[in-house]
């Protein structure tokens, strides 16, 4: 194992164009180390602007093996008005991933947030069903064969484990889940189909229990759910990282073929906390990978909490080095 001590140097990224820098980064790729332990990927999120940032892009290219579009594949970005699709941002990420041999997790097809008003205003069941089907089919067929997995539905549960109140549940009840997954399976039969949510960080929490119960029921009914994604946004006042393994084990108990940590960030980014989550995934056989929600703290949605593996100057933190050393 090549350790990553060199990444601690304050001059590491002084010349990102240098092939020597890229070589050193690649020799200590967190993705390569994780895959060597039998997992599919260790990835991050990005989009066009970040991939055109040379400092950010060099790290993505050298150190991560999977990309999730942070915003470019959400409904408001792809279909802002009915039947009018805008693929520029999503195409950029998909093309980058193909060129650089990165897996892609598509994110996300059906979500109550970042949803155009024209969708939110639908009240007719048949209309909403057709809108969901057309949206999913159009997007998934465009990227068929390029997207390893899709977050088909995202954040559909309340904290008590019941279905979230949204236009989808209001108009269609829980049947929108079946509609979405069946449409997705038909559009790209080889893509892994996920249900994704946050606060699934304790096996004993009501939301986790609700997810487990509903997914078991839907699987028994033949809904083609392949995986459960746990976003894993950890904060100082939230769930302890010590519950990660138990939570992933509970999610895996539903019978899905895969579980994954899909949007990991940890307030303070301590080495111990990151290692706890990495070890949790390593210890749960069906946990296929980890995606951290960004590269540098500078670009994080929680930048003030310094939650990522690279600081605001694109320097690898102790947590990154600790993971490499442990692997």
Swiss-Prot record:
Gene3D superfamilies referenced in this protein's UniProt entry, alphabetically: Glycosidases (3.20.20.80)
Pathway: Glycan degradation; xylan degradation
Thermal properties: Optimum temperature is 60 degrees Celsius.
EC number: 3.2.1.8
Annotated source species: Aspergillus oryzae (strain ATCC 42149 / RIB 40) (Yellow koji mold)
Protein name: Endo-1,4-beta-xylanase F1
Top-level EC class as recorded in UniProt: hydrolase
Role according to the record: Endo-1,4-beta-xylanase involved in the hydrolysis of xylan, a major structural heterogeneous polysaccharide found in plant biomass representing the second most abundant polysaccharide in the biosphere, after cellulose.
Localization: Secreted
Residues at the catalytic site: 155, 263
Domain (GH10): residue spans on this chain: 45-326
């Amino acid at each position: 194992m090549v350790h990553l001590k060199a990444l601690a140097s304050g001059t590491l990224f002084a010349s990102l164009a240098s092939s020597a820098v890229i070589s050193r980064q690649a020799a200590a790729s967190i993705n390569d180390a994780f895959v060597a332990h039998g997992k599919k990927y260790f990835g991050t999120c990005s989009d066009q602007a970040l991939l055109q940032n040379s400092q950010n892009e060099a790290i993505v290219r050298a150190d991560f093996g999977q990309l999730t579009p942070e915003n470019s594949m959400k409904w408001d970005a792809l279909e802002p008005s009915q039947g009018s699709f805008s693929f520029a941002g999503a195409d950029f990420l998909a093309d980058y991933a193909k060129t650089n041999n990165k897996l892609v997790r598509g994110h996300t097809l059906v979500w109550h947030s970042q949803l155009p008003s024209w969708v939110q205003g639908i009240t007719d069941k048949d209309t909403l069903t057709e809108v969901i089907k057309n949206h999913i089919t159009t997007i998934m067929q465009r990227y068929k064969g390029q997207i390893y997995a899709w977050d088909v539905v995202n954040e559909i549960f309340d904290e008590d484990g019941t279905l979230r109140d949204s236009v989808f549940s209001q108009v269609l009840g829980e049947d929108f889940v079946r509609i979405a997954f069946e449409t997705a399976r038909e559009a790209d039969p080889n893509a892994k189909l996920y249900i994704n949510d946050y606060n699934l960080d304790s096996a004993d929490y009501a939301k986790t229990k609700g997810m487990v119960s509903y997914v078991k029921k839907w699987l028994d009914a033949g809904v083609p759910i392949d995986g459960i994604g746990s976003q894993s946004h950890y904060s100082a006042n939230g769930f302890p990282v010590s519950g990660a393994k138990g939570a992933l084990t509970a999610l895996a108990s539903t019978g899905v073929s895969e579980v994954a940590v899909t949007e990991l960030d940890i307030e303070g980014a301590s080495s111990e906390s990151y290692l706890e989550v990495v070890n949790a995934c390593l210890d749960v056989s069906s946990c296929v990978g980890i995606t951290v929600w960004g590269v540098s703290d500078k670009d994080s949605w929680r930048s003030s909490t310094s939650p990522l593996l690279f600081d605001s100057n694109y320097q690898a933190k102790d947590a990154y080095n600790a993971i490499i050393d442990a692997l």
